[in-house]
Swiss-Prot record:
Subcellular localization, as worded in the UniProt entry: Cell membrane
GO molecular function: RNA binding; RNA endonuclease activity
A Pfam family this chain is assigned to: KH_1
Topology relative to the membrane: Single-pass membrane protein
Record protein name field: Ribonuclease Y
Keywords: Cell membrane, Endonuclease, Hydrolase, Membrane, Nuclease, RNA-binding, Transmembrane, Transmembrane helix, Virulence
PROSITE patterns: HD, KH_TYPE_1
Residue ranges of the TM segments: 3-23
Function noted in UniProt: Endoribonuclease that initiates mRNA decay.
PANTHER family for the chain: RIBONUCLEASE Y (PTHR12826:SF15)
Organism of origin: Staphylococcus aureus (strain JH9)
Residue span(s) of domain HD: 335-428
UniProt similarity note: Belongs to the RNase Y family.
Length: 519
């Protein structure tokens, strides 16, 4: 390779380097120019956006300012109108006051004129009265001189003569006034009673001594009776209610004079039929469950009754006793319904006489409360009711109303008299009571009480409409030999003390159970 070639190569390299540098520099300048242009564009765009945002914010501020100005102007207009209305009202009141003031001024002037006239007339009357008195004195002196009697003697003689003439007329007038007053009192009393009776519309139906349980089919009767009658005997023994299973299709009749026991038996039997499992153990469980259900129903009935008559703050135990009245009858009349009716009647009578209606309702509701437990406690229902009212802190007026509603003691308040009157109204209403049913129930109660009076007797149930008394005894106190003796003693006492048609079967039941648990 010669020198020329080397120079050419070197020249080419130099030219290449120079050319590359020039190209690179041009490219760099071009990129810088583009970057500057881009930066300027970005800045310009940012300025434009900032201007737009500024314009938007200004517009929004103007709009908000306009809205605020309009709201402020509206509030100002409303306040101005309100002030104008108030000013108008004040002006009207001021005008009214001015008119009233003018009227009062005129009335004062008229009154002053009348007073002056009255004073003038009074002076004239006084002058005339003085002259009349002078004339009277002169005439009296002249009469005394002529008659020879003093003024006092003449007055006494005249009064005696007038008294003799009027004595008979006065006696006749007094007699007429007494008759008129008596007729007025009778009429007022009748109007009060009629008003109270007309304001109360109450329906009562005579209570029955039987309940009917419907069955899904007649095959259920055999299951209720059980093998050799053990199921029906268990149910009758636990409830004291007679189960009558006859040809009546798909029905069993429960007979018993105690409505609570009958309801327990009915509830238990309905639950047994629904459950389908009928055997002595299950019967015991269902009877216990039915007792709890009936106990709840009793308490609910008491609470409903106290709520209906607005008798608040009554002791819970007393409320429950009131609920028991729902299962008690008096001559066929439901005692709870009767008590509520008496409460309403007493309240209406109290309202007519201006007495305390709430207290009258409370006394009316509780007047027969002793009947709820009179078959469990010794004494009349009045005595028991008084003791219950005292025990649970009732008002003295309520206690006296209970004590006096049958005339056992004198009533000490108008409320007591009104409760007695309301009780008589409710009981005397046609169809409210039946004498025969009450006598029948009393005979059955007496039969049970007589049987339970012997030692060792746990329970006694009158069944078969009173033709049988079933006596449950304690096996620890009464053995088999004593059972026969007890049956004979009860039979003899029934024959001596009770009156009854036909004959009564005395059955003494002694049951011993041995229970062990396998573990």
């Amino acid at each position: 390779m010669n020198l020329l070639s080397l120079l050419l190569i070197l020249l080419g390299i130099i030219l290449g380097v120079v050319g590359g540098y020039v190209v690179a520099r041009n490219l760099l300048l071009q990129k810088q120019s583009q970057a500057r242009q881009t930066a300027e564009d970005i800045v310009n765009q940012a300025h434009k956006e900032a201007d737009n945002i500024k314009k938007e914010k200004l517009l929004e501020a103007k709009e908000e300012n306009q809205i605020l100005r309009e709201q402020t102007e509206a509030e100002l207009r409303e306040r101005r109108s309100e002030l104008q209305r108030q000013e108008t009202r004040l002006l009207q009141k001021e005008e009214n006051l001015e008119r009233k003031s003018d009227l009062l001024d005129k009335k004062d002037e008229i009154l002053e004129q009348k007073e002056s006239k009255i004073e003038e007339k009074q002076q004239q009357v006084d002058a005339k009265e003085s002259s009349v008195q002078t004339l009277i004195m002169k005439h009296e002196q002249e009469l005394e001189r002529i008659s020879g009697l003093t003024q006092e003697e003449a007055i006494n003689e005249q009064l005696q003569r007038v008294e003799e003439e009027l004595s008979q007329d006065i006696a006749v007038l007094v007699k007429e006034k007494e008759k008129e007053a008596k007729e007025k009192v009778d009429k007022t009393a009748k109007e009060l009673l009629a008003t109270a009776v007309q304001r109360l519309a109450a329906d009562h139906t005579s209570e029955s001594t039987v309940s009917v349980v419907n069955l899904p089919n007649d095959e259920m009767k055999g299951r209720i009776i059980g093998r050799e009658g053990r199921n029906i005997r268990t149910l009758e023994t636990l409830t004291g209610i007679d189960l009558i299973i006859d040809d009546t299709p798909e029905a069993v009749i429960l007979s018993g004079f105690d409505p609570i026991r009958r309801e327990i038996a009915r509830t238990a039997l309905v639950n047994l039929v629904s459950d389908g499992r009928i055997h002595p153990g299950r019967i015991e469980d269902m009877v216990e469950k039915a007792r709890k259900e009936v106990d709840y129903i009793i308490r609910e009935a008491g609470e409903q009754a106290t709520f209906e008559v607005n008798a608040h703050n009554m002791h819970p135990d007393l409320v429950k006793i009131v609920g028991r009245l729902n299962y008690r009858t008096s001559y066929g009349q439901n005692v709870l319904k009767h008590s509520i009716e008496v409460a309403h009647l007493a309240s209406m009578l109290a309202a007519e006489l201006g007495e305390d209606e709430t207290l009258a309702k409370r006394a009316g509701l509780l007047h027969d409360v002793g009947k709820a437990i009179d078959h469990e406690v010794e004494g009349s229902h009045v005595e028991i009711g008084v003791e219950l009212a005292k025990k649970y802190g009732e008002n003295e007026t309520v206690i006296n109303a209970i004590h006096s509603h049958h005339g056992d003691v004198e009533p000490t308040s108008i409320i007591s008299i009104l409760v007695a009157a309301a009780d008589a109204l409710s009981a005397a209403r046609p169809g409210a009571r039946k004498e025969t049913l009450e006598n029948y129930i009393r005979r059955l109660e007496r039969l049970e009480t007589l049987s339970e009076s012997y030692d060792g007797v746990e329970k006694a149930f009158a069944i078969q409409a009173g033709r049988e008394i079933r006596v449950i005894v304690s096996p620890e106190e009464i053995d088999d030999l004593k059972s026969y003796r007890l049956a004979r003693d009860i039979k003899n006492q029934i024959e001596d003390e009770l009156q009854y048609p036909g004959h009564i079967k005395v059955t003494v039941v002694r049951e011993t159970r041995a229970v062990e648990y396998a573990k």
